[in-house]
A protein has these predicted regions:
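Tubulin/FtsZ superfamily GTPase core signature
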Residues: 1-216
């Protein structure tokens, strides 16, 4: 009921009975498998899919690789944008997240990982946890929107779906950065902010491809 998207698939009705997967990725996996046909129906005629999840729990960690498998089998460009738990959530949740990322990495074209701990590099350390989660949700949204806008937005130089596919197909682990600036040299400052974002899980050194978009 809290999800406002137009089409929803309620996975695992028989397995979890609406109770969640309780940090058990196997239950999350079984839940997605239970509704495989419904997921396939929703993904029909789709060219590109973004999978977003918080790794470390049962549903996101277990179900996301299954959905990725379905999408790849259907020839869909599959991009996962996921988070890793805060350190204070405990070593067990972090271990589950790492195991889930290992499975997911081989099942998507492009994997973007945002460590939750990095959020405190851009917000005050005293920020309440719920507010921190809100900020992380905003970053996930902006990451997906930034890629989608490259295809849909009009500009002097347009990027089409073929360009996106050329860079993101079988790309492996990737990073995303967003920079905003104003005034003199704003473009250069925004680029510097984007490539040096404290949220990046790794450097862009050695990257085989780059998608770069400027708007404003």
């Amino acid at each position: 009921e809290n999800c406002e998207v137009r089409r929803k698939v309620h996975i695992g009705k028989a397995i979890t009975r609406g109770m969640g997967a309780g940090m058990n990725p196997e239950l999350g996996q079984q839940s997605a498998e239970e509704n495989r046909e419904e997921i396939e129906a929703v993904l029909k005629d789709t060219d590109m899919i973004f999978l977003t999840a918080g790794m470390g729990g049962g549903t996101g960690t277990g179900a996301t690789p299954v959905i990725a498998d379905i999408a790849r089998d259907m020839g869909i460009l599959t991009v996962a944008v996921v988070t890793k738990p805060f350190s204070f959530e405990g070593s067990a949740r972090m271990r589950i997240a790492e195991e889930g990322l290992s499975k997911l990495r081989d099942r998507v074209d492009t994997l973007l990982v945002i460590p939750n701990d990095r959020i405190f590099n851009i917000i005050d350390a005293s920020t309440p946890v719920l507010k921190a989660f809100d900020k992380i949700d905003e970053i996930l949204k902006n990451s997906v929107r930034g890629i989608a806008d490259m295809i849909t937005a009009s500009g002097l130089v347009n990027v089409d779906f073929a360009d996106i596919t050329a860079v993101m197909k079988d790309a492996g682990t990737a990073v995303v950065g967003v920079g905003i600036s104003k005034g003199k040299d704003r473009a250069a400052k925004a680029v510097d902010e984007a490539i040096n974002s404290p949220l990046l899980d790794s450097s862009i050194d050695g990257a085989r491809g780059v998608l770069f978009s400027v708007s404003g």
